[in-house]
From Swiss-Prot:
It comes from Nostoc sp. (strain PCC 7120 / SAG 25.82 / UTEX 2576). Residues 230-306 form the KH type-2 domain. PANTHER family: GTPASE ERA, GTPASE ERA, MITOCHONDRIAL. Pfam families: KH_2 (PF07650), MMR_HSR1 (PF01926). The lineage of its organism: Bacteria, Bacillati, Cyanobacteriota, Cyanophyceae, Nostocales. It is a peripheral membrane protein. The gene is era. This is GTPase Era. One of its GO terms (molecular function) is GTPase activity. One of its GO terms (cellular component) is cytosol. Its main location: cytoplasm. Keywords: Cell inner membrane, Cell membrane, Cytoplasm, GTP-binding, Membrane, Nucleotide-binding, Ribosome biogenesis, RNA-binding, rRNA-binding. Residues 86-89 are annotated as: G3. Residues 148-151 are annotated as: G4.
Length: 324
């Protein structure tokens, strides 16, 4: 089974939950558990998730708060099954959406077996890292400090390393350095995580790499292109609703609505003569075709919903709610 087909089979697994699901019995020494990936915005949590599972299931961009939903990535080896939970970056919220994202990230800390606290190894430990560290000391969940972006460290990185050594020593956390971008030292990270897991069952079929349905990932791939192609004022005000997915033997038809808060943002997304919307659609279509390993017809619409990020009702309609 190809990587693309592993993701494309998600809906089949989910739709069969009411019946029998093919989950084998784990051997006696098998380990399994849930690992929460926690950290400030833009420290590389989603890039790490994609590297660990071996394919793209989480979108990435230079824009803070790219991740909005708790996304699970599943890594299964002969010895263990690791379920990684990628969470929104923890920050001070400024609206209802921000509050939902941060609450979900905090809930993840209490609902996992191990916390992987990811920091940016290209810069010294800062106030945002210490804020998260203070949250973690109130949790009984074991914590591993993961220092990412070692490939981007300056030649003289001694002070950077010392700042994280002090943090790890203060809280008595084991530490591992790696690069999510290049994959360097990720086997060592995975080995350390397995050491902290208990013996347990398969939670998911061994060939599954995420528990999210295709429609969710399609929406995220569209949002990713908006983050990459539009100016700073638009990305945080965007939500995607997948209105239709219609499969035929030759092509999959996808209709999606892009929700924004202001008419000016709608104008930016459409662009002169529809040029921006065309660019977004073309780039998103390519990514969705990789996801499902087939041809896609993608049609995008833009709708203004004033202050949707500040309305609990609107947030719920668009799929954003505090997770249990």
């Amino acid at each position: 089974m190809t990587a693309e087909l592993k993701v494309a089979s998600i809906d089949n697994h989910i739709s069969s939950l009411s019946g029998e699901v093919s989950i084998p019995q784990a051997p006696p020494e098998f380990k399994s558990g849930f690992i929460g990936i926690i950290g400030r915005p833009n420290v590389g949590k989603s890039t790490l998730m994609n590297q660990l599972v071996g394919q793209k299931i989480a979108i990435t961009s230079p824009v803070a708060q790219t991740t909005r939903n708790r996304l699970r990535g599943i890594v299964t080896t002969p010895e263990a099954q690791l379920i990684f939970v990628d969470t929104p970056g923890i920050h001070k919220p400024h609206h209802q959406l921000g509050e939902v994202l941060v609450k979900n990230a905090k809930l993840a800390i209490e609902s996992v077996d191990v916390v992987l606290f990811v920091v940016d190894g290209a810069v010294a430990c800062g106030a945002g890292d210490r804020f998260i560290a203070d949250l973690l000391i109130h949790s009984k969940t074991p914590v591993i400090l993961g220092i990412n972006k070692v490939d981007q460290q300056p030649p003289d990185s001694q002070k950077i390393d010392e700042s994280y050594q002090q943090l790890a020593s203060a809280y008595q956390w084991p530490t591992v350095k790696f690069s999510a971008k290049t994959g360097a030292e990720l086997p060592q990270l995975q080995e350390l995580l397995v050491e902290h897991l208990e013996h347990g069952p398969y939670y998911y079929p061994p060939d599954l790499v995420t528990d999210q349905p295709e429609r969710f990932i399609m929406g995220e791939l569209i949002r990713e292109q908006i983050l990459l192609l539009t100016r700073e004022e638009v990305p945080h005000s965007v939500a995607i609703a997948i209105d239709l997915v219609e499969e035929t033997p030759t092509i999959t038809r996808v209709l999606a609505t892009i929700h924004v808060e202001r008419d000016s943002q709608k104008g930016i997304l459409i662009g002169k003569g529809g040029s921006m919307l065309k660019s977004i659609g073309s780039a998103a279509r390519e990514q969705i075709q990789k996801l499902i390993a087939g041809k896609v017809y993608l049609e995008l619409f833009v709708k203004v919903q004033p202050k949707w990020r500040h309305s609990r009702v609107r947030l719920a309609e668009l799929g954003y709610r505090v997770e249990e």
